[in-house]
Amino acid sequence: MKVNPSVKPMCDKCRVIRRHRRVMVICVDPRHKQRQG
């Protein structure tokens, strides 16, 4: 899980979602998981 000021999809499978007022990227590749913070 990377915590970045700006989250961007890294591949075609990445999905940008909002959970509990947080912007997150979920993907089949665990290295692509990101959270804004």
Curated annotation (Swiss-Prot):
User: What's the domain of life for this entry?
Assistant: Bacteria
Does Cell division show up as a keyword for this record? no
Keyword DNA damage carried by entry: no
Give me the Gene Ontology terms describing cellular component. cytoplasm; ribonucleoprotein complex; ribosome
One GO BP annotation is: translation
Q: Which GO terms describe its molecular function?
A: structural constituent of ribosome
Q: Which UniProt keywords apply?
A: Ribonucleoprotein, Ribosomal protein
Q: Which PROSITE patterns does the UniProt entry name for this protein?
A: RIBOSOMAL_L36
Sorted alphabetically, which NCBIfam families does this protein's record hold?
A: rpmJ_bact
Q: Which family does it belong to?
A: Belongs to the bacterial ribosomal protein bL36 family.
Q: What is this protein called?
A: Large ribosomal subunit protein bL36
**UniProt source species:** Mycobacterium leprae (strain TN)
